[in-house]
Structure formats: structure tokens, C-alpha cells
A protein has these predicted regions:
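Metabolite-binding pocket within alpha/beta catalytic cores that recognizes anionic/polar moieties
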Residues: 1-127
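Generic secondary-structure signature for well-ordered alpha-helical cores
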Residues: 79, 105-108, 140-148, 179
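Active-site rim beta-loop-alpha module in soluble metabolic enzymes
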Residues: 129-176
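Residue-level detector of short coil/turn "hinge" positions at structural boundaries
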Residues: 66, 81, 150-152, 181
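Residue-level recognition of alpha-helix initiation/capping sites
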Residues: 32, 65, 134, 164-166, ...
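Catalytic beta/alpha-barrel core
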Residues: 129, 180-183
Length: 183
């Protein structure tokens, strides 16, 4: 049995970090099958679990990713704090390409995942405050020390993203609404 107890899960792919901190590859069993693109170890003395967002080498559209499997894998390791890094499209014209955003809110325009298995452990997610205030504060504090553009309290708008990406008109609308990033 694995005695390592991660405090934070990072949903990301950063092979350089995995190598730098000598994170150990692990397989996490779930009711959906094993998740084998997971890594555990210490990053600056914090015990972390790194799990690829598109694990197991999947090359599928976002709507075919089994998010339930990711959630279950994280839960099975006892982690309650999750940080995700994602590639998104910038809407805010004041922020240059390559900017970093710390999200403060989100707008859901992508509908519902009809493949979600409603026969298991159903509960609604509380989304009034969608991001952890303590983690957000830590990210903002760290961001204030960076020498590149960081927008804190950014608004993220979800978009299905498959089989198409946003139209010019949709992006203009999102910008007029004051939203910062889309994905």
C-alpha cells in the first residue's frame, strides 16, 4: 500500500517539473479502470499528486474525456485541494499573448455532459464561489512577485470547443460582457 499522502493535486502536464522534482510515476485504480499518468512526490516540500488532464495518452475531444475518472483518482488518493492549469484563449485585449490568469469566477456556456453517469454518487456542485479563496489568495500573492503579466480575479467562460471553436461574434460578445478567457 502506498503510504505517501499528497495534500494537493495538480491537473497539468509538465514533464520538466516531473523530472526536476523526481516525481514517481504511480497508477491509481478507479471504478473506470486504472489511471497511469500520475506522479507523486514533493514539490518545494509540499506532497503533491500530478495527474495529466488527458491521461493515458488519450487524443480525444474534450467532451470525451472521462472527468469522473479523474475526480475519482484524486479522491482515491485522499486529496481535497486541486489546482488545474489549462490552455485557454484570451479574450481581454488588455492582456498580451502568454499572460497568466488567476480565475475568480466562471460562466458556464458549454451545457451539460450527457455522458455523466447519473447512477453513481450524485450531488450538485456548489458553484456560487467556484474557486477556493485560500488557494486563490496564495496564487495571487505569488503572482504579485512575477515579472510577467498576471490578471487576478479573471472570469473564465466555458465553451464546448468541439466540433468547433468560438466564432468571431461569440468572442466579441464575451469581450463586451467583460469576460477574460475562454476554453
Amino acid at each position: 500500500m502506498n503510504e505517501f499522502k499528497p495534500k494537493v493535486a495538480l491537473i497539468m502536464r509538465n514533464d520538466e517539473m516531473i523530472e526536476k522534482f523526481n516525481l514517481k510515476r504511480v497508477t491509481i485504480d478507479t471504478s473506470f479502470g486504472p489511471v497511469d499518468r500520475c506522479f507523486e512526490g514533493y514539490v518545494y516540500n509540499v506532497p503533491v499528486l500530478v495527474i495529466y488532464g488527458r491521461f493515458n495518452g488519450q487524443k480525444v475531444p474534450s467532451n470525451e474525456i472521462n472527468f469522473q475518472q479523474t475526480i475519482e483518482a484524486i479522491k482515491n488518493r485522499g486529496v481535497t485541494k486541486v489546482i488545474g492549469t489549462f490552455v485557454v484563449g484570451g479574450i481581454n485585449p488588455k492582456m498580451p499573448q502568454g499572460s497568466v490568469y488567476v480565475l475568480g469566477d466562471l460562466i458556464g456556456m458549454s451545457g451539460y455532459n450527457i455522458k455523466w453517469d447519473r447512477n453513481i454518487s450524485f450531488h450538485n456542485a456548489e458553484m456560487y464561489e467556484p474557486f477556493c479563496p485560500q488557494l486563490t489568495k496564495k496564487l495571487c500573492d505569488a503572482a504579485s512577485k512575477m515579472d510577467f503579466p498576471v490578471k487576478t480575479d479573471a472570469t473564465y467562460v466555458t465553451f464546448y470547443g468541439w466540433p468547433r471553436i468560438e466564432t468571431k461574434g461569440e468572442l466579441k460578445f464575451y469581450n463586451k460582457m467583460g469576460w477574460d478567457v475562454v476554453g
